A protein has these predicted regions:
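A short, N-terminal "cap"/entry segment at the start of jelly-roll beta-barrel domains
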Residues: 1-38, 83-84, 126-130
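Conserved hydrophobic/aromatic beta-strand scaffold that supports enzyme active sites
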Residues: 28-30, 41-45, 62, 83, ...
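Active-site region of the double-stranded beta-helix
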Residues: 30-37, 48-60
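Short acidic-glycine-tyrosine-enriched beta hairpin
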Residues: 35, 76-97, 104-105
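Short histidine-centered beta-strand/loop micro-motifs
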Residues: 42-44, 52-57, 74, 83-84, ...
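Histidine-centered metal-chelating micro-motifs
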Residues: 50-53, 71, 90-102, 119
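Glycine- and acidic-residue-biased ligand/ion/polar-headgroup-sensing regions
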Residues: 57-77
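Double-stranded beta-helix
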Residues: 80, 101-130
């Protein structure tokens, strides 16, 4: 069982508004950053069944699901929808560039993200038209 005390972290909370047709409710805590070499480590926690904003990672990204479940909704090269489910303990690494949204499972989610970007660009938020 994961035993890291997240209550001592400084969390920044994000919510959607009436102009979103999906429930946005997540928080980010910076664990560490080394801007001179383009490294950022984050914890992100989601409320049950909540989403983050639609976005694209520009940096190489390491993902480790610590608690709960991550539903990843990607857009394939041909515009097709791809749904992946990652459970606690699942690890992934991607080079960046994929359009996607993430949604927590019914018990929420706590996920570690490590970004590596030589130019300092990590991700960009997008609208439905990209």
């Amino acid at each position: 069982m994961f035993q890291f005390d997240t209550s001592k972290l400084e969390w920044t909370h994000f919510e959607g508004g009436p102009h979103f047709d999906y429930h946005i409710d997540y928080a980010i805590a910076v664990l560490g950053a080394q801007p001179d070499i383009g490294v950022l480590d984050l914890l992100v926690k989601w409320a049950p069944n909540a989403y983050c904003h639609y976005h694209r990672h520009l940096a190489a990204t390491t993902t480790l699901v610590l608690e709960g479940e991550q539903n990843l909704y990607e857009v394939g090269d041909g515009g097709e929808a791809i749904h992946k489910v990652r459970k606690a303990g699942d690890y992934a690494h991607s080079p960046g560039g994929d359009l996607h949204m993430e949604q927590a499972g019914p018990d929420g989610a706590l996920i570690f993200f490590g970004f590596q970007s030589p130019d300092g660009r990590l991700f960009e938020t997008l609208d439905k038209a990209h």
